[in-house]
Amino acid sequence: MATDIDMLIDLGLDLSDSDLDEDPPEPAESRRDDLESDSSGECSSSDEDMEDPHGEDGPEPILDAARPAVRPSRPEDPGVPSTQTPRPTERQGPNDPQPAPHSVWSRLGARRPSCSPEQHGGKVARLQPPPTKAQPARGGRRGRRRGRGRGGPGAADGLSDPRRRAPRTNRNPGDRPGAGWTDGPGAPHGEAWRGSEQPDPPGGPRTRGVRQAPPPLMTLAIAPPPADPRAPAPERKAPAADTIDATTRLVLRSISERAAVDRISESFGRSAQVMPDPFGGQPFPAANSPWAPVLAGQGGPFDAETRRVSWETLVAHGPSLYRTFAGNPRAASTAKAMRDCVLRQENFIEALASADETLAWCKMCIHHNLPLRPQDPIIGTTAAVLDNLATRLRPFLQCYLKARGLCGLDELCSRRRLADIKDIASFVFVILARLANRVERGVAEIDYATLGVGVGEKMHFYLPGACMAGLIEILDTHRQECSSRVCELTASHIVAPPYVHGKYFYCNSLF
């Protein structure tokens, strides 16, 4: 028996006299339940695998003494009493003496294990009491098993109020739950477990019946505090005052010091000397050209009737003028600048004639399959024709296009869609806007589709003079249909613009 005692002491088991008492054998069903409840992957090789294969002789009592006790019934099941399964009877040899009622175990006290609980992950670690609880009374393995199981301390209170039951996740050094369920005395429902939840260790197995802890506070989305409506608004810097600076004011006032009748007269004289020779001695070559009268400079006003040509004449002699523009780029650049200035100062009838001139020139080029060149003086000044017509017809077209259910003038010129063409007015502005856009973009050559002409087609839908005749017609028609007196006056003044009323005074303090 001395040998058995030494072996038990060396194993580090804290056994009392009650562990060696003779108890009835443990049922197999209770043992299986106990093994399932402790199946966390942690087992002690020092006490569960020491079965002696030689029968009843030898250290057989060590196996029975170290065998895990049966987990008691769960106290949370109502109506099921907490019973203890009797321990199996210790088997003894025929020559072994009976243990005394008061043996040496009751006087030795607790034996300090040879290794720390942290280093021992087996049954030694599981037998340690929770660090937050007081040391239980020495009552053998049954008392400690009762404290570890679900029927431990606090089970009676848990039966009285199951709603106040809260899981305890205090870990023992062996990474086992210290207690199954416990109650927080006086704590409200659900508050006991919220303050004691601990997450499972990284990489370790998740224990059944233990709730996961909520994520840390730093990972939660925290809304900013609401702004106090009574708090003063942040100060904003006042924008800089929009004024004329002092230097510019001095420059404006200094004009009076330089302005004089003599200087104004000298300015008119110098300008008149430049205009008779705009090409600077390098005009278009006009020898033996049918276009010689218009290629050279002219001192008098332009008379459209003296420059009238038929469509057949334009078709016959148009290519020679086209080649003149293409073969003299410097003269063509000068002619383009001069034409732009002239077109922006034309009256309404002259502006309509310029629109017809541009479209008829494009039709002639298409007729002879000539490229539409943006450097051409006629095609390159389309924007001037468009701007002048839009300025003169804008007051009238606001009423006319709205009455016809068409797009506004600005929208027609910005969209530049062939599908928006519904009459002669929309045709003129859309086609001129498309040509001006291509010239502004600086394309090398304008395709015929810009004017709505398909492949292999001619510009048969346009007849020279349609711009002037068509726009004068709609002015007269709408003036009779519209009941607005303002619209009638506007349309009449566009067609026949003699001065009747409008200017009130002329003020000049300088000369």
Swiss-Prot record:
Family listed: Belongs to the HHV-1 ICP27 protein family.
Residue positions of motif Nuclear localization signal: 110-138
InterPro entries on file: HHV-1_REF-bd, ICP27-like
Compositional bias annotation for Acidic residues: 16-26, 35-51
UniProt GO BP: regulation of DNA-templated transcription; symbiont-mediated activation of host NF-kappaB cascade; symbiont-mediated perturbation of host cell cycle G1/S transition checkpoint; symbiont-mediated suppression of host gene expression; symbiont-mediated suppression of host mRNA processing
Lineage: Viruses, Duplodnaviria, Heunggongvirae, Peploviricota, Herviviricetes
Organism from which the protein derives: Human herpesvirus 1 (strain HFEM) (HHV-1)
Location relative to the cell: Host cytoplasm; Host nucleus
Function: Multifunctional regulator of the expression of viral genes that contributes to the shutoff of host protein synthesis and mediates nuclear export of viral intronless mRNAs. Early in infection, this immediate early (EI) protein mediates the inhibition of cellular splicing. This results in the accumulation of unprocessed 3'end pre-mRNAs which can't be exported from the nucleus. Cellular protein synthesis is thereby shut off early after virus infection.
Protein name as it appears in the record: mRNA export factor
Composition bias, Pro residues: 213-232
Extent of Low complexity compositional bias: 1-15
Keywords: Activation of host NF-kappa-B by virus, Activator, Early protein, Eukaryotic host gene expression shutoff by virus, G1/S host cell cycle checkpoint dysregulation by virus, Host cytoplasm, Host gene expression shutoff by virus, Host mRNA suppression by virus, Host nucleus, Host-virus interaction, Inhibition of host pre-mRNA processing by virus, Metal-binding, Methylation, Modulation of host cell cycle by virus, Phosphoprotein, RNA-binding, Transcription, Transcription regulation, Zinc, Zinc-finger
Location of the motif Nuclear export signal: 5-17
Pfam assignment, any one: HHV-1_VABD
Post-translational modification note: Methylated within the RGG box possibly by host PRMT1. When hypomethylated, ICP27 is exported to the cytoplasm earlier and more rapidly. Phosphorylated.
Residue segments, region Disordered: 1-244
Record's comment describing the protein's domains: Binds viral intronless RNAs through the RGG region.
Region (Interaction with host ALYREF): 104-112
Record's subunit section: Interacts with host RBP1; this interaction facilitates the RNA polymerase recruitment to viral transcription sites. Interacts (via the RGG box) with host ALYREF/THOC4; this interaction recruits ALYREF to viral replication compartments and probably directs viral mRNA to the TAP/NFX1 pathway. Interacts (via the RGG box) with host SRPK1; this interaction relocalizes SRPK1 to the nucleus and seems to alter its activity. Interacts with ICP4; this interaction modulates ICP4 DNA-binding activity. Interacts with host NXF1; this interaction allows efficient export of HSV-1 early and late transcripts.
Gene Ontology MF term list: RNA binding; zinc ion binding
Record: residues binding Zn(2+): C399, H478, C482, C487
